[in-house]
Amino acid sequence: FVLLSSIFFQFHKQVMFVNYMPFLFLMLRSIDHYFIDHHFTGIIIWGSCIVLHSYFYCIACFIVCFIYFVMQCANHKEYKKPLFHLLIAYVGIVLLTAIYTIPTLYVIAGGSKSVSSTHLLDLLMPTFSLKGLLYNNYGCGFTYLIWILIVCGLYKKKTRLLSLIIIISMFCPLICFIMNGFLYARSKILIVFIPLIILQAGLVLEDFTFRINYSMLILIILPLFFITQPYLV
């Protein structure tokens, strides 16, 4: 993780793009502990730290944590009570940080200029360049091998859903638009997916037995025709 180009680059240029990462990892670990002792205090504490350190990225971080939480619910075959506890934790985070976040959300809600300049049709058109995943000033900084592993994950029941979520997030500008607080659709917000992408790569490699078929091959090579900097693959 610490060797990713995006982490080095953002720490040098704009640390606010990655300064929430330690707390994001701690919040994810707190989710693991929740399914052991059923205490969600850690989720509230580290979630509040994310908001206080980088409120602009907190929405995206909470979406990532929600995805991971649902994955853990599926593993433990329990949904209703854990999801209710997560809702309580998120409400607790909002209440603890309200004095800081409510004025900010009010200002963002009034920023109609940025929203109106983004056309809905542009948000619905998929982008196959993978600039949010591969080496890019504002991407996750992975190599093309990670994309191959994500595609392979589609062909295993255990990893299919997470691969699908990652692929849709990387291809659909609307996801970036929502995670950026409805301001713009820049791909730098996808940096928050780094923990999930690393997890997915590990899950795929854990049981790496695949038969290459035509659909898999097409998905693997498709982005190569849209990447503007092929020497970075």
For each feature predicted by the language model, list its residue ranges.
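Transmembrane alpha-helices and membrane-interface helical segments
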Residues: 25-33, 65-73, 149-153, 193-213
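Juxtamembrane/interfacial segments around transmembrane helices
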Residues: 47-53, 71-72, 93-98, 115, ...
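Short, well-ordered loop/turn and helix-capping segments at boundaries between secondary-structure elements
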Residues: 72-76, 101, 176-180, 198-202
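Periplasmic/ER-lumenal interhelical loops and adjacent helix-loop junctions
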Residues: 82-191, 230-233
